Amino acid sequence: MKKAAVLAVVLSLGLAGCSKNYNDQYHGNGYRAEILFSEYNGENLTLTVRKNNCEHEDGPIETIQIGHKYDSTLVVGACVRVLDNNEGLKNISTFNPRSPL
């Protein structure tokens, strides 16, 4: 009985990990990028990012300016997800490409 319970838990964790990675790959109008440079201009944060899916050293470079308070996770070298709502508003969130499993 214990083996069946352990097997069920391990299987559900594995499936949850796979579904999380699947959803991260298909996130709509966005892309993954690596932060190359960050600078505050008043209350706006200007980020220079490379659209490289956080995997390659090459890719197009984009400068993004957002109104954002200080966030210690948006540092140079961090992998971020940039979402665009097609109206000029962009949302930046950190993304960890390493799977915890």
From Swiss-Prot:
Signal sequence, start to end: 1-17
Top-level taxonomy: Bacteria, Pseudomonadati, Pseudomonadota, Gammaproteobacteria, Pasteurellales
Sites of N-palmitoyl cysteine lipidation: 18
Subcellular location: Cell membrane
A Gene Ontology cellular-component term: plasma membrane
Keywords, ordered alphabetically: Cell membrane, Lipoprotein, Membrane, Palmitate, Signal
Coiled coil regions in record: none
Protein name in the entry: Uncharacterized lipoprotein PM0553
UniProt membrane topology term: Lipid-anchor
Residues with lipidation of kind S-diacylglycerol cysteine: 18
